[in-house]
């Protein structure tokens, strides 16, 4: 689990994520769609796969990931009952995000792993 220190670091890093959300989000989505093309079906409301479309939607996705830093203690309930995030595809997205962000934000590996665990725990 995330320690109090981890949570503090994660919340601090959110500013960097938000500042670069469109660029990093677009790169992450492009990587996700290239490595796991079937994940496009989970983006049914998103049909603009142009560079600009990915940039804008990638920004929304990455900002949504940043938003969960305010809910680190109840991720499973939030995502399982309110946001309805598919727990099976989040690890694929988190891997794409990690590859994109690893050079800049190393602490996110642990954070994204905890998000994936929290999402999965709600469905057991």
UniProtKB/Swiss-Prot annotation:
Heme b binds at residue 79. GO terms for molecular function: haptoglobin binding; heme binding; metal ion binding; organic acid binding; oxygen binding; oxygen carrier activity; peroxidase activity. O2 binds at residue 57. GO terms for cellular component: blood microparticle; haptoglobin-hemoglobin complex; hemoglobin complex. The keyword Heme applies. Keywords: Heme, Iron, Metal-binding, Oxygen transport, Transport. InterPro entries: Globin, Globin-like_sf, Globin/Proto, Hemoglobin_oxygen_transport. One of its GO terms (biological process) is hydrogen peroxide catabolic process. Coiled coil: none annotated. Red blood cells (at protein level). Residues 1-124 form the Globin domain. Involved in oxygen transport from gills to the various peripheral tissues. This fish has three hemoglobins: Hb 1, Hb 2 and Hb 3. They all have a similar Bohr effect. PANTHER family: HEMOGLOBIN FAMILY MEMBER. Hb 1 is a heterotetramer of two alpha and two beta-1 chains. Hb 2 is a heterotetramer of two alpha and two beta-2 chains. Hb 3 is a heterotetramer of two alpha and two beta-3 chains. Belongs to the globin family. This is Hemoglobin subunit alpha. The lineage of its organism: Eukaryota, Metazoa, Chordata, Craniata, Vertebrata.
